[in-house]
């Protein structure tokens, strides 16, 4: 409140968006807390995003998918060009996933800005991953020296393996920027991500028997990864509580979801949410069947009541849908 009160005249003068105000609030908070490192994530794209006023110590682009195409472009190359807008002069950029469609875009922008560039998945990889006691356990291998490091992650979704490779590549460049790297603390951080960061909703198990999982997958690429995770899971029947927002390519998402699941269509309490009844109609057209509920937690309780102890109950489709479950619990 004090932040917004202090800048109220400026808000009235330039009429910033809600996101722009929260970005300013975050920057002010980081300054006041004197943080050593702040991880700033773009809201949408990169080139024109309000977070892009900073000059970072390292730029990171995880991967490129077909999302926000109405604003960023309808090809991977166009979307990559927008994302590449965060590449700054003489500042290293790490690309998480290489791709024939986008590599040249990043290489070209990096060269124009004299920015050192590395592709994480060309330098490191993971193997021998297993789930153990709620953790994702894997070997992280450096291709340049064949060093193997055993890592445990408290984010158990197998898709975190890609993120681990990206993070490891970023971290290895920190000593050159004046930061002391302590491998034991890095491994501790991997194992305690949720506790250290408050990051939730990434194949997050919140209940056993039945297994209740939250995942914020909300676009085509994210849903593809989520479906792979479902296929790797052991369960009797699958119950999916699904709520989405209006501005996503909903039909593409629906076509990816398993038709054998029991669906509980719902909506978060925000204006952007697609009404549950309309979502159900679109889902029916894609061969997905279930009932609609106007409240996320009501939908979840119905799913749990129908599930056996061996079943999997998954809440997904939007950050807002998952967020409402976290507010009230199971």
Where are these regions (language model features)?
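ATP-dependent carboxylate-amine ligase catalytic core
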Residues: 1-54, 70-72, 100-101
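Nucleotide phosphate-binding/pyrophosphate-handling subdomain across enzymes
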Residues: 32-33, 37-42, 50-60, 64-69, ...
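Conserved catalytic-core segment of NTP-binding enzymes
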Residues: 46-47, 55-115
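Beta-strand->loop->alpha-helix junctions that form or flank phosphate-binding loops
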Residues: 96-97, 111-131, 153-158, 187-193, ...
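C-terminal helical cap/extension that packs against the catalytic core
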Residues: 99-109, 114, 211-214, 220, ...
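Acidic-glycine-rich active-site phosphate/pyrophosphate-binding loop
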Residues: 130-147
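Active-site-proximal loop/hinge segments that shape catalytic or ion-binding/gating pockets
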Residues: 318
